[in-house]
Amino acid sequence: MTDTLRIGTYNIHKGLSSFSVRMVLHDQRELIRSLGVDIMFLQEVRGKHDRHSRLFTGGQYEFLADSIWQSFAYGKNAVRSNTDHGNAILSKYPIVQWENEDISAHPTEERGLLHCEIEVPGWDVNLHCICVHLGLLGSWRHQQLIALENRIKSMVPEGAPLIIAGDFNDWRQKAGNTLAADLGLKEVFEHTMGKPARSFPSVLPFFRLDRIYTRGFDIKHTKIHSGPRFANTSDHAALTADLRKL
C-alpha cells in the first residue's frame, strides 16, 4: 500500500518548442520522466497529426506514456482537418473509469474537463483526478469553473481524495476563491509558498497560470520546474507536488 503520490502538471504546447520552432516531443518525454511522478496531468496534447505520423504512432499521450505510465486517458477537445488536441492524464495506477466533459464557452475555443477515477493499491476509495485547460477570457473561465464545481458536487463522493490540475489561464487569480470556498480545495503552492506558482512564460516565469488543487491530502513538497531545459521544450513550466493521503 502507498499513501504518498507525486503528481505533476505540464502544458506541452502540442509538442513544440516555446516559439513553435521545432518538434520537441522526445525532449519532453525525457523531462517528464525525470520528474518521477506517479500521475501526470497534460494540456495541449495532440491525439493525432497527419504530418507527424511518421515520427510516432498513436497520439502524443501514448508516446509520452511509453512503458512508465501504463494507464492513460485522452480527452479530445479541438478537432481540425488533419489534427486534434486536448488534455491527457498518465498514471502508473489503473484508470478504471474516465469521461471528457465539453465545457467550451465559445465556438472558437474548445475546452474540456478530463475526469479519471484511479485505483491506487490499498486505498479504500478511488482517487478522482480532473485535468483542465480553461479559456482565455475571464467570462469564459467563470462559466467553466461553474461547470467544474457542478461536476465535482455531482460526480465526486464527499470523502473521496481529489486532485484538479492544469492550465487555468487564471492570471487574475480568481479561480481559487471559488474552489477553496465552495469545494474545500487547497492549491498546493498557495499552501507552501503563499501564492500560486509563476509558470508562464517558462523562459522567465511571471504569470501564475498553472495550478494544482487537492482535497483529502497533506501537501508535503512542491516544485516549479523551469530554467533552460524546460524553456526549450514548452512555453509553460512544469509543476510537481508530493502528497500524502489523509
Task: Give short role names for the model-derived ranges.
Residues 42-46:
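Acidic/histidine-rich, surface-exposed loop or edge segments in extracytoplasmic proteins
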Residues 55-61, 186-190:
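Secondary-structure junction/capping motif
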Residues 52, 59-68:
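Glycosyltransferases and closely related glycan-assembly transferases
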Residues 1-39, 66-67, 71-74, 80-246:
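Active-site regions of metal-assisted phosphoester/phosphodiester hydrolases
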Residues 17-22, 47-58:
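Short, flexible/disordered intra-domain loops and linkers
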